[in-house]
Amino acid sequence: MLDTKFDELMEFPASFPFKIVGDASDTLADRVVAVAQSLAPGDYAPTTKASSKGTYNSVTIRITVTSKEHIEKLYTQLAAIEGVKRVL
């Protein structure tokens, strides 16, 4: 797992924003929501923004997390989505 200090800095459960940057794709937001649903079922309304040249899309989604391990698992699973370049 990742070596983070979320457990020292946050109280759980908490609403946590994730920003996923990936190749421009009409399905990126759907794939992000699918991962979120698999690890933290909920009603999600992500926002999507295209880069100035249209090469990349960023998807921002707020997910209710329950622990440090939950955040780390989400980061790992979101980063594994095909076409994803960064998870912030």
Curated annotation (Swiss-Prot):
Domain of life: Bacteria
Gene3D superfamilies named among the record's database cross-references: 3.30.70.260
GO terms under cellular component: cytosol
Pfam families (UniProt xref): DUF493
Family assignment from sequence similarity: Belongs to the UPF0250 family.
Protein name: UPF0250 protein Spea_3154
Organism for this UniProt entry: Shewanella pealeana (strain ATCC 700345 / ANG-SQ1)
